[in-house]
Amino acid sequence: MEKINKLKKILKSENIDGYIVPKNDEFFGEYIPDYKDRLKYISNFTGSYGFALILTNQNFLFVDGRYTLQAHKQCGNLFKIKTIPNELPGDILKNKKLKIGFDPNLFTSRTMNIFFSKTNCKFIPLNYNLIDKIWKRKENKQKKKFYILPNNSASERYQSKINKIIFEMRKNKAEFFFISASENNAWLLNIRGNDSKYTPIPHSYILIDKMKNINFFCDLQKIPSSFKKNFDKIKFINVNNIKNILSKITRKKFIIDGSTCSFFFENIISENNKIINNQDPIYFLKSIKTKNEIENIKKAHIYDGAALTKYLFWIKNNFEKKKITEISAAQKLFNFRKKNKNFKFLSFPTISGSGPNGAIIHYKATKTSNRRLNKGEI
């Protein structure tokens, strides 16, 4: 409650009536590092999706059906829990005329339109994040390098992929394409990173023009020396310079994807340029798998299926003899998986729930919720 009260004091000093706190960070991935989890900080909610609407006199937490039970358990005392799409912010704000602030780096214009367009409220993009004013965040200073995919894993050479992007740009008569989805940048250049706990993505943005000039924006400490040799025609630029570079481009035609391009970047680009708001063509291009990719997908399923089969056999033969808990069971499955030499990490936290915990969608066992596996329970 102390954190919320501090935030509400800031609302008063900013002369606004409310503030929206999303789960995501500026890269809009499903999983974010702890030091960027502002929603968890202000609400205690640990699910992978949701946002808080904090008004001067009420607090609301919006989640989807996966997390309704979890949200009530974790923060039902301080927040009114609302389940999307049954209840939307527009329903609460319908007859109000409030000034509500938000961080434009953490929202897309599409998200704002979906959730907040049907109100009489004024939504104000702020130049700073209000949660950061009360939270002394400790950023992870360990910078793990990006890396290039081995040839037997890449679908095709990155130069060929860029030609396909240029074709899409010419088709739309666009002079620039701003790629804001990190996973699409990874596909385009055949690279990977360590910026998400469960997905090997390199947090980045790409700006490509019709002459194939490419600017790659990221934390430069993550760029290995091998990149300069392999990507000699690509400029690697500190992500802090992106606003300055985009602001200097005028009277051009840009392709952006409104589902991944932040409100902040869309505003900068649209101020002096014409925008074509299309779905990023990379989503379609990367959905077409080569024979090699299909074979690798099959192998991954076989390897993981073998680990899961060994785990189920172990559970069947040991759960009555030994004390097996939700956490120890999840650890055992992890141990079976990591025996494979190609194993990198999990694709999401293992959902290991027994008895009543099994009813919680996307449940993640903790020291306080951890239960023993008992006979007769699912």
What residue spans do the PLM features occupy?
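Conserved catalytic alpha/beta cores of large enzymes that bind or transform nucleotide phosphates
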Residues: L98, F102, S226-P281, K286
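Terminal amphipathic helices with adjacent charged low-complexity linkers/tails
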Residues: T119-N140, C261-N296
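Amphipathic alpha-helical
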Residues: G18-P22, E326-F348
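N-terminal accessory/capping or targeting/presequence segment of soluble
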Residues: M1-K94, F107, T111-K248, A307, ...
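Loop/turn positions that initiate beta-strands
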Residues: G376-I378
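Conserved short loop/turn motifs at secondary-structure junctions
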Residues: G101-F107, S153-A154, N184, P281-L285, ...
